[in-house]
Amino acid sequence: LIIDNNDLQFIEHSVQEKIRNDSIDIVFNIYEGKKDLVEKINITGNNVTNEDVIRGELIIDEGDPYINLQLEKSIAKIRARGIFKKVAYNVQDGSKNNLKIINIKVEEGATGEISAGAGIGTSGGTLVFALQENNWLGEGKVVAFEADIDEESFIGRLNYSNPNYNFLGNSINYFIENQSNDKPDLGYENSVL
C-alpha cells in the first residue's frame, strides 16, 4: 500500500519472523531492488477475445518499471473477468540485462449461458427463457436477453454491459425492458417500455 500510494518504483521487500517462547518478532525489510523495465508483453491463446480486452486489464505496460506486485494484480484482474478458463504467465530476460519480457497465456473458456424454466401453479403456468453472452464479439462486453411469459403477461429484458468502459476500469450498463399485461377478466390491457 505504501508503494502504491507513493508511486515508489523498484522497491522490494522481505519478511522475517522470529518465534520466541512468548513472542513473535516480525521484521519487514524494504529496500531498493534491481531496476528492471518491461521490454515487451506477449499475449497468446486468445483466439476469440481481442487483445485490447486483455491489455485493458493490465496495470503494467511496456516501458514501465517491472514490479512483480503490479504484474500479479494485472493477472488477477484478467482472471476476474471470468472469460478465460486459465491464465498463466512467465517472465524472461529481455534483450538487455535490465529488460524483462512478460508472456501471458490465456485459455478461452465458455462464455455463453442458456437457461429455461417452466412452472405451473394455481394461477396458471409460466415460462422463462434467458440467453447471456459474457464476451460479445470477443470484446469482453456482456449481452443478455430474458423473457418471462405467462397467461396474462409478457416481460422481456435486453441488457448490455461494458465492464471496462474506455479502459478506465468503469462499467457502463444499458437495459431495455418491455412489460405487457392482458387481463381480460378485469377488463384492461397495458404495455410499459
Regions found by a protein language model. Give the residues of each.
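Gram-negative/organellar outer-membrane beta-barrel architecture
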Residues: 48, 67-193
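Acidic, glycine-rich low-complexity/disordered segments
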Residues: 1-93, 112, 168
